[in-house]
């Protein structure tokens, strides 16, 4: 058990992380960096995973692909990818190619860094991104992508003070964050990542890095150490509570004092119906996306009873403010899933936020579930994301209230004649 400031205790258990493969990051990163191509060195399993997870047909020519490892490749010293790289350049004309690792070639001890350097040119760099599920939670693969981009961020001179938002968000959310910062008088240096490879932000000793995703601690530390940038330690901008604190703390970094309590109250007022439904509900968060801490904090402040908040990894410094806001909540790192099953059966929570792997079994036992993956894909940041965030939590509760109980005959009527 670990103690963090504010008398919050983190219970450390012994489980491997039940999570999507890190290759899933391709789904949002290739859409964000619009002149990129993501190449995965993997197996047929990787191909089936991406085909099903991303729902992209091959004739759509998406800006990602898989170089398949066959049985014959197991005896080779290193895979040969020159022809594939040439084909990618001819078909897609990318400005950068990300070479992602997967489990099998990592077990084979493929030298990915050497391979990427060999394939890289000045015109089209090939950047290695460790993304296999052997090491990282799937959202941390975005951290690895940003890690690879750091050398391509210009060095900002001393005295050039502005904010760089850290984390991939869609263009509409990026516009909202930029507009809000400028309205508060905060100079904006850009986003990491930007939508084009040649537009990555300049980062230097007077840059303030504002993480907007809670799973980017490694790249934040790298920029802090290598560029001398200052990392904003605050709540993440999810929900009225987190958004107010985030913007007030960020403004303070620039010597600007703002009081956004009225705006926070107005945001809570907009989701009164949702919070009324959440109030008093027992919510259980299993480890998956590493977004669990800020989501649990929002639920707690919305009046729900968070019976457990578990996460794959917790960084006591990077997540310090979120942990302080969770006083009184059971917080577990790398939870033992078998223990969680027993606790869920005993506690009978009203809502479980869980992974795609465990959602259907929980639903089959009569629990109301929400896929944690959905919080990754929806625009839930800052003031504009308050209503979408609240709706994500209440939609399964509203749906269940309109459905008959699982033991009613309506569920098998006309489906299995032998069961009638």
UniProtKB/Swiss-Prot annotation:
It is an enzyme of class 1 (oxidoreductase). Pfam families: Oxidored_nitro (PF00148). It comes from the Bacteria. Its cofactor is [4Fe-4S] cluster. Keywords: 4Fe-4S, ATP-binding, Bacteriochlorophyll biosynthesis, Chlorophyll biosynthesis, Iron, Iron-sulfur, Metal-binding, Nucleotide-binding, Oxidoreductase, Photosynthesis. One of its GO terms (biological process) is light-independent bacteriochlorophyll biosynthetic process. The keyword Cell membrane does not apply. Pathway: Porphyrin-containing compound metabolism; bacteriochlorophyll biosynthesis (light-independent). NCBIfam families: DPOR_bchN, PRK02842.1. HAMAP family: ChlN_BchN (MF_00352). This is Light-independent protochlorophyllide reductase subunit N. It comes from Chlorobium phaeobacteroides (strain DSM 266 / SMG 266 / 2430).
């Amino acid at each position: 058990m670990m103690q963090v400031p504010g008398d919050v205790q983190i219970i450390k258990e012994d489980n491997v992380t039940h999570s999507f493969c890190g290759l899933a990051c391709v789904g949002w990163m290739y859409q964000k960096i619009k002149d990129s191509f993501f190449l995965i060195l993997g197996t047929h399993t990787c191909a089936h995973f991406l085909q099903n997870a991303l729902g992209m047909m091959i004739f759509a020519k998406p800006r990602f692909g898989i170089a398949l490892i066959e049985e014959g490749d197991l005896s080779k010293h290193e895979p040969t990818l020159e022809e594939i790289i040439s084909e990618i350049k001819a078909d897609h004309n990318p400005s950068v190619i990300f070479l992602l690792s997967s489990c099998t070639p990592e077990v084979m001890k493929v030298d990915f860094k050497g391979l990427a350097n060999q394939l890289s040119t000045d015109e089209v760099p090939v950047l290695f991104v460790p993304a296999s599920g052997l090491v990282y939670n799937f959202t941390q693969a975005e951290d690895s992508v940003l890690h690879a981009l750091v050398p391509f961020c210009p060095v900002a001179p001393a005295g050039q003070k502005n904010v760089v938002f850290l984390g991939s968000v869609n263009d509409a959310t990026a516009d909202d964050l930029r507009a809000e910062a400028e309205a508060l008088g905060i100079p904006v240096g850009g986003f990491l990542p930007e939508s084009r490879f040649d537009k990555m932000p300049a980062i230097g000793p007077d840059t303030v890095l504002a993480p907007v995703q809670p799973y980017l601690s490694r790249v934040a530390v790298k920029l802090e150490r290598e560029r001398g940038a200052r990392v904003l330690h605050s709540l993440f901008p999810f929900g009225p509570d987190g958004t107010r604190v985030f913007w007030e703390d960020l403004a303070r970094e620039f010597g600007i004092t703002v009081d956004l309590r009225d705006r926070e109250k107005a945001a809570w007022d907009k989701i009164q119906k949702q919070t009324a439904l959440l109030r008093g509900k027992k919510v259980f968060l299993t480890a998956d996306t590493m977004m669990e801490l800020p989501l649990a904090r929002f639920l707690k402040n919305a009046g729900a009873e968070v019976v457990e908040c578990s996460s794959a990894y917790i960084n006591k410094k990077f997540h310090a403010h979120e942990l302080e806001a969770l006083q009184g909540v059971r917080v577990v790192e790398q939870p033992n899933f078998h223990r969680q099953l027993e606790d869920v059966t005993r506690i009978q929570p009203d809502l479980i936020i869980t992974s795609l792997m465990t959602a259907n079994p929980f639903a089959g036992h009569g629990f109301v579930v929400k896929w944690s993956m959905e919080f990754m894909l929806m625009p839930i940041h800052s003031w504009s994301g308050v209503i979408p965030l609240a709706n994500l939590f209440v939609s399964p509760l509203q749906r269940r209230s309109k459905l008959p109980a699982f033991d009613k005959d309506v569920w098998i009527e006309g489906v299995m004649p032998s069961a009638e």
